[in-house]
């Protein structure tokens, strides 16, 4: 058998490349000095630099919209408190220059919890997995948070109208 098989070398290289890319994509970075703008946007220090972060795959009511202030308070509940370690998993940079990704409070997936508790919508336009839609169905069935209002308007609709 030929040890210099180019197909084997290519396969090995692809496996190594995949490992490097995926391990980097899933690395968590610790955030410091967090301030909350609204239910899906925060400012924080990441590696000593102040950044604006947008929570991936979810959308929350705007502050002037019904349930907007409550949504912000939900996020505060998940992020503020003694001994909470807040981490961030980067996905991309958006057109406004914000870092987009997932927040974790310890092991808790904050983006998921925001939807599950009825504090956010699964953002149909950007959601990549079904888990947020399952969480949203749970919140709707149990009339949690914004789902107490049967006529709740998704933020992307509200923004177009206002």
Which role does the model predict for each range below?
Residues 2-162:
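Small beta-barrel nucleic-acid-binding modules, primarily SNase/OB-fold domains
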């Amino acid at each position: 058998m030929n040890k210099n098989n180019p197909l084997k070398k290519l396969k090995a290289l692809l496996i190594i490349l995949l490992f490097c890319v995926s391990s980097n994509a899933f690395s968590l970075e610790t955030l410091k000095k967090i301030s909350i703008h609204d239910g899906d946007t925060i400012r924080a220090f990441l590696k000593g630099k102040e950044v604006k972060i947008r929570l991936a795959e979810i959308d929350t009511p705007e502050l002037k919209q019904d349930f907007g202030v409550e949504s912000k308070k939900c996020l505060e509940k998940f992020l503020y408190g003694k001994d909470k370690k807040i981490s961030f998993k980067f996905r991309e940079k958006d057109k406004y220059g914000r870092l987009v990704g997932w927040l974790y409070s310890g092991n808790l997936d904050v983006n998921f919890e925001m939807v599950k508790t009825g504090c956010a919508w699964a953002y149909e336009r950007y959601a990549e997995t079904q888990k947020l839609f399952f969480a949203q169905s749970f919140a709707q069935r149990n009339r949690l948070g914004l789902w107490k209002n049967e006529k709740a308007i998704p933020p992307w609709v509200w923004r177009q109208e206002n």
